Regions:
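A short beta-strand-turn-helix
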Residues: 3-4, 8-40
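Short pre-active-site segment immediately N-terminal to redox-active cysteine/selenocysteine motifs
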Residues: 37-40, 45-48, 112
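Conserved redox-active cysteine motifs that mediate thiol-disulfide chemistry
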Residues: 44-61
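Conserved segment of the thioredoxin-like fold in thiol-based oxidoreductases
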Residues: 54, 69-100, 113
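Extracytoplasmic/secreted envelope proteins and their assembly/folding machinery
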Residues: 56-60, 79-86, 136-139, 143
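Thiol/disulfide oxidoreductase modules built on the thioredoxin-like
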Residues: 87-92, 99-158
Length: 158
């Protein structure tokens, strides 16, 4: 599995990831990231990541209040731990791909988890947020990026 195009550049739309074992949520494929009417949010998370737990509620609220499309990449995580974590905190993800080896993380240039991407309908990364989307400044910055990307209407308050 490669996430790079023929030119060697990151191509998020080229990534196909199997579902996390034990979850009913389907895996993540190219078709899930391209051709959508609005940009898709891709959140890279892990059950062992303390900041991921902190941002989970914020992302869940954005999905529930704003109707955003959120998909996840479970990074270097044991499937049973991810399943337990999502059962405890809730699962706001429409799809979750498993990156058990960390290969996608390398190809996407992750510096750590969590990281959250806004992906346009053509598979282009429109915005990348490194770290947890928590706190007033982070949430405001991320919401402005969602507006600029066309995922939220200006004045839409979550």
């Amino acid at each position: 599995m490669r996430c790079q195009g023929s030119d060697g550049q990151l191509d998020v739309a080229a990534c196909d990831l199997a579902a996390v074992d034990g979850l009913e949520t389907p895996g993540l494929s190219r078709a899930d990231l391209v051709g959508n009417p609005r940009p898709v949010i891709v959140n890279v998370f892990a059950s062992w990541c303390v900041p991921c737990r902190a941002e989970h509620g914020v992302l869940t609220q954005m999905v529930e209040k704003d109707g955003l499309t959120l998909v996840g990449i479970n990074y270097k995580d044991k499937p049973e731990d991810a399943t337990k974590w999502l059962a405890e905190l809730g699962n706001p993800y429409e799809r979750i791909g498993s990156d058990l080896s960390g290969r996608v993380g390398i190809e996407w240039g992750l510096s750590g988890v969590p990281e959250t991407f806004i992906v346009g309908s053509d598979g282009t990364v429109l915005f990348r947020y490194v770290g947890p989307v928590v706190g007033e400044t982070a949430i405001s910055t991320f919401r402005e990026a969602l507006i600029q990307a066309g995922a939220l209407a200006r004045g839409q308050n979550g």
